[in-house]
Amino acid sequence: MELSDANLQTLTEYLKKTLDPDPAIRRPAEKFLESVEGNQNYPLLLLTLLEKSQDNVIKVCASVTFKNYIKRNWRIVEDEPNKICEADRVAIKANIVHLMLSSPEQIQKQLSDAISIIGREDFPQKWPDLLTEMVNRFQSGDFHVINGVLRTAHSLFKRYRHEFKSNELWTEIKLVLDAFALPLTNLFKATIELCSTHANDASALRILFSSLILISKLFYSLNFQDLPEFFEDNMETWMNNFHTLLTLDNKLLQTDDEEEAGLLELLKSQICDNAALYAQKYDEEFQRYLPRFVTAIWNLLVTTGREVKYDLLVSNAIQFLASVCERPHYKNLFEDQNTLTSICEKVIVPNMEFRAADEEAFEDNSEEYIRRDLEGSDIDTRRRAACDLVRGLCKFFEGPVTGIFSGYVNSMLQEYAKNPSVNWKHKDAAIYLVTSLASKAQTQKHGITQANELVNLTEFFVNHILPDLKSNNVNEFPVLKADGIKYIMIFRNQVPKEHLLVSIPLLISHLEAESIVVHTYAAHALERLFTMRGSNNTTLFTAAEIAPFVEILLTNLFKALTLPGSSENEYIMKAIMRSFSLLQEAIIPYIPTLITQLTQKLLAVSKNPSKPHFNHYMFEAICLSIRITCKANPAAVVNFEEALFLVFTEILQNDVQEFIPYVFQVMSLLLETHKNDIPSSYMALFPHLLQPVLWERTGNIPALVRLLQAFLERGSSTIATAAADKIPGLLGVFQKLIASKANDHQGFYLLNSIIEHMPPESVDQYRKQIFILLFQRLQNSKTTKFIKSFLVFINLYCIKYGALALQEIFDGIQPKMFGMVLEKIIIPEIQKVSGNVEKKICAVGITKLLTECPPMMDTEYTKLWTPLLQSLIGLFELPEDDSIPDEEHFIDIEDTPGYQTAFSQLAFAGKKEHDPVGQMVNNPKIHLAQSLHKLSTACPGRVPSMVSTSLNAEALQYLQGYLQAASVTLL
């Protein structure tokens, strides 16, 4: 694509169409842009539009399109073509910083994100002048430019907060500090001076405080991994100014908005975070500043209002106190009883109250409420921070704190009892307080794992939780119902089983509650209870114990999916999946009805898949229906095919990318259930599975390979006769997969199935070419993963076609190649093979090479016989060699190129491990002994001589053990 006015005009028209609400106009425009984005100059045309277009809407659209293009294509993925030509990469990096800084804020943010994506890949090695260019802009004095630089630096450096320590990371941070720390500090001081100068200018203050927020965020990122020497030397400057800003109050920066945090709140919140970081990680160096910060933050807490806009500030301030009180250094600041009482009374209890804003979220924004409350994204809420402070105080003062709070809990419950309909919020706070007090350690998976022994959890459950749940009206006091259900979830490991069993029918009835939060919590609680393990590592609740409730459980779960707001509720679908898994054959009578409902749901959501977790659990539930029913009655597979195939066809025809990998997995499960030949409905699909376009999407590959393996296992003879012309296509898929480091193991899965199941004559003409392809890959790009897969394949080939056939095919490619493969690959690398079945295949294959390959006994290959036997005994007896060559250590084969749909394995579609030598060989050590005995019978005297003269003593001892166990000798 040329950088011409005509192309700019065309691009403008298509960008405009991508904003059209009509899909008939929008989608073709999106497809067109996708089709041209691989052309040279495409990204430069977008940047030119950004600079030259007069239409602001088009400029914003171009900036978003450019950012998404960079997100999808900038990373260079091994084995994949480079999606952006080098000239475009150079031009983008040369122009983007200037363009970003000279653009309006809306566009600046998009380009700043694009710079951070590029920087993540290229900085510092491939973009060494980025920092210099950014730092030089600090001198401009233009805070629009300066804030652009700070915003970009923040998005570049914030990853230092969660990266693992490494030399590479240290080197990068040092480079950044050397270039950035001093200019940032000077800018910090200058900005604070300007705040004093412009103290009465609201618009100037807004810009300056935006800068201070970004500077404070950068301080956090640059100090997170370790305390840099520069910041230690300049701690006075930073901490004194942070303290001043923390105590600052300027009427011009206060906002009337009760919801949205203002600049002053955001800055103080970040300073609390910075102080907490230093208090936690660098307490020795920070010690002399700490008392001033504790005082300032305490004053902040007792003077800040209850409005939502202060939530982040208050929660960060409380988190600061929580991090301080946990450190032995600062224990003395909190040990006075009056201090503890004051903290409880003035900070913890007020911030645990259920406010009008919380009630509004509970009723009108339930999805967000659940996300915060159940999934732990409540990190910045007042309640969560207050809860963390309680836990922190309990570390050293558990007795006094429990005593103080017990009084509060009792008085709250008394207030509630006086007038429940008015005072229900008192009980809500009491439950939350008990939960905070009792929870010492908690995980999402297991609930509370360590509890405060001073709190009687069962007594509280029986007296205050069960009565609410036993009420006949499931819609009364929904917040308290949700609290009670959450209590069951959190303390499920502490409450005795008999009480939990009583709760199950109550939870089932709450699936009918109108409140989204209540019926979601009920579903989640049931799912968590059904995954609990008993003492013998089976489920705590048996199918027999749940049997009385099966019908009402399944009815209410599926009915809950019809309640307003829950048509794609992932917690309900997960509970359905877990119920199926626990109840097993007890669900069979209900399956005809349930599979219809699941299929209807699948058809509905396939129109616009938007809830990935819901979709995943739905497919898991479908797989469970198939597994459980067909285990009892394999012929029932036909009923599932009738129910599902119409929907599956629609999904495949409409190219619903998110669902295609799932469809292939379910089809594999169905096909594997057939015991005889492949039904014609599957064979009609077979040619379509080989289309290259399907294999271009990484997320499809594991599911497609599994499905092709099912075709080969169930219908190799049909393929050989009715679809012989498709065998080259099948091998073409293998060739594509084997060329990729990320997918070569999938290529071997396919190849192994071809070798194991296809009639030999149908692949004869391709065999030599298969080996040549494998050797080319070995030569060009040898990895440990490839070697392991290659070893399994050649041994499987040996088992299937015979040892002599393996030797002949190697030597047919190149004279003496068989010896080279033995010497350079099999003998030194066999120790790396992992997996019981894989080791067994290799053991049986090598045994065949040792005992059924005449050239091993009477040619130049004979010298390799004993080393090969030695390596086989090593495979049996030595630990697996899991060392990885240095150059391979950093290959990340899991990287998904761009933003394609990743593969999601369905647990309940899982394939049983297949052992191709299971019927032939039970114990490979005994098999070796018997095979050596047979060989020694054919060549008397030779085998004992070779073994006794060349095998090391330890290996010889192991071999004698095998012979003894097999009751044979070497003649």
Swiss-Prot record:
Q: Which UniProt keywords apply?
A: Acetylation, Cytoplasm, Nucleus, Phosphoprotein, Protein transport, Transport
Q: Which residues carry this modification: N-acetylmethionine?
A: 1
Q: Name one GO cellular component term.
A: cytosol
Q: What happens when the gene is disrupted?
A: Complete embryonic lethality at around 5.5 dpc.
Q: Where in the cell is it found?
A: Cytoplasm; Nucleus
PROSITE patterns documented for this protein: IMPORTIN_B_NT
Mainly localized where? cytoplasm
So which domain of life are we looking at?
A: Eukaryota
Q: Where on the chain is N6-acetyllysine found, per UniProt?
A: 574, 824
Q: Which residues form the Importin N-terminal domain?
A: 29-102
Tissues/organs with expression: Ubiquitous. Detected in embryos from 5 to 17 dpc. Highly expressed in adult testis, heart, brain, lung, liver, skeletal muscle, spleen and kidney.
Its BP terms in the Gene Ontology are: intracellular protein transport; nucleocytoplasmic transport
Q: GO MF annotations for this entry?
A: small GTPase binding
Q: Which residues carry this modification: Phosphoserine?
A: 112, 931
Q: Does Hydrolase count among this protein's keywords?
A: no
Q: Which SMART domains match?
A: IBN_N (SM00913)
PANTHER family for the chain: EXPORTIN-2 (PTHR10997:SF8), IMPORTIN-7, 8, 11 (PTHR10997)
Q: Which family does it belong to?
A: Belongs to the XPO2/CSE1 family.
Q: What is the role of the protein in this entry?
A: Export receptor for importin-alpha. Mediates importin-alpha re-export from the nucleus to the cytoplasm after import substrates (cargos) have been released into the nucleoplasm. In the nucleus binds cooperatively to importin-alpha and to the GTPase Ran in its active GTP-bound form. Docking of this trimeric complex to the nuclear pore complex (NPC) is mediated through binding to nucleoporins.
Cite the record's note on assembly: Found in a complex with CSE1L/XPO2, Ran and KPNA2. Binds with high affinity to importin-alpha only in the presence of RanGTP. The complex is dissociated by the combined action of RanBP1 and RanGAP1. Interacts with CFTR.
Give the protein name, as stated in the record: Exportin-2
Protein's organism: Mus musculus (Mouse)
Lineage of the source organism? Answer: Eukaryota, Metazoa, Chordata, Craniata, Vertebrata
